[in-house]
Amino acid sequence: MLYRSALRTSRAFTPRLALSHSRLVSSLVFLEHKAGKLSEASLSAVTAAKTLGNDTHGLLVGTKSEIENALDRAKEIKGLSKIYLARSDSYSHSLAEALASLLASIVSAKDVSHLFAAHTAVGKNVFPRLAGLLDSSLIADIIALESSGDTFTRPIYAGNAVLTIKSSPKDSVKIVTVRSTAFDKAPVAAGSAVIEDVDIITVDTPTQFVSEELTVSSRPDLASAARVVSGGRALKSKESFDAILNPLADSLGAAVGASRAAVDAGYADNSLQVGQTGKVVAPELYVAIGISGAIQHLAGMKESKMIIAINKDPDAPIFQVADVGLVADLFESVPQLVKELGNVKV
């Protein structure tokens, strides 16, 4: 099902930045990183930006040490002709007020026609504020775009329909977040980007960073893992969830995920939730254990390359999207699978 719509924004107030359309010649990608480690999702945003055929530039923001660590990999990204650096301690925690003001100033000074970021927590926090500063529409969570640069595609209704959006010609810059699973990652090899520092923008804001608690895990990051093992409410308890899923995930070198039902029941942390209101993943292998296959969960994993489902209910909706299905008691079949995997190299 295809819908076509044109987004319009109210022009009740004067835009804070007036840009000349004749000078808009480049695309800018916000290169997200965590403590100097470049986000894999940003590589997909680079690929989306390259679709337009414009010069594509990147932006790294953070403390001096963070940028030095991230730049080693960022400057190797194929397709970026320039990387802007904004080095300041005020950017160390990605506060939306500071980053939005910085991005707005760069858009004005560097002739940017399109601004891209991955549709992550940071992108979803910063880009709506930026759209407000520039008085432009926010085009969020796209899965495709046309080379014309004004037509975009995004999923709606939990991925059961696709919306085609034609942005308003009044928007001085197109502000876009990208669903990373919909685009290949830009190669990190043989890059030749020119490095340029940009002016730091100081923002007077009441928002202050207080603290953060990081969960340390030896497993791959769920959002970018090549293999994911997810569990549902059928695991019955947190103890069973850990006892059944963790050995299989360890055998496969996989990340652990969970359905919303499992998270709501307290079996797994909210950070592990896969689905419409959780993380959207598209690994090479997705193993769904004790997950019925509610539409909200399918929206977060149905683009996986290979889906294996284990469920004792032969009518479970998960089997409709699975490439391989096993109708069995998970408490018997999964330990047996782990035992068999111990005899082979995965």
Swiss-Prot record:
InterPro entries: DHS-like_NAD/FAD-binding_dom (IPR029035), ETF_a/b_N (IPR014730), ETF_a/FixB (IPR001308), ETF_alpha_N (IPR033947), ETF_asu_C (IPR014731), ETF_asu_C_CS (IPR018206), Rossmann-like_a/b/a_fold (IPR014729). The keyword Zinc does not apply. Disulfide bonds: none annotated. GO terms for molecular function: electron transfer activity; flavin adenine dinucleotide binding. SMART domains: ETF. Signal peptide: none annotated. PROSITE patterns: ETF_ALPHA (PS00696). GO terms for cellular component: mitochondrial matrix. SUPFAM superfamilies: Adenine nucleotide alpha hydrolases-like (SSF52402), DHS-like NAD/FAD-binding domain (SSF52467). FAD binds at residues 285-313. Its main location: mitochondrion. GO terms for biological process: fatty acid beta-oxidation using acyl-CoA dehydrogenase. Belongs to the ETF alpha-subunit/FixB family. The electron transfer flavoprotein serves as a specific electron acceptor for several dehydrogenases, including five acyl-CoA dehydrogenases, glutaryl-CoA and sarcosine dehydrogenase. It transfers the electrons to the main mitochondrial respiratory chain via ETF-ubiquinone oxidoreductase (ETF dehydrogenase). This is Probable electron transfer flavoprotein subunit alpha, mitochondrial.
